[in-house]
């Protein structure tokens, strides 16, 4: 039976460490690992329809994250009066110096699309 097919409960400490290292450096979590190591920005789409652009300082396998220098962006549609005119949505943002983001609110994490390619 290979290490991949074994349940975690049956793995040795070395096998667990190797599997975790592979998950964080090769799999989808590698984007977060690279962001922490190289201090790159990432863009995070959240379930509340807001976007976060910031630097990841720490994270875990559940995508809980500690972020710094975060720009939170969202759009709001202002309430209109009695007129039948449709209101235009307004882009809003705010700066957050440090924050903890719970992983269950994360939909998507991508490298900063506006950063120059390296």
Swiss-Prot record:
Pfam families, per the entry: LSM
CDD domains the UniProt entry points to: Sm_D2 (cd01720)
Residue ranges constituting the Sm domain according to the UniProt record: 29-115
Keyword Cytoplasm applies: yes
GO cellular component, one term: U5 snRNP
Family the UniProt entry places it in: Belongs to the snRNP core protein family.
Protein name from the UniProt record: Probable small nuclear ribonucleoprotein Sm D2
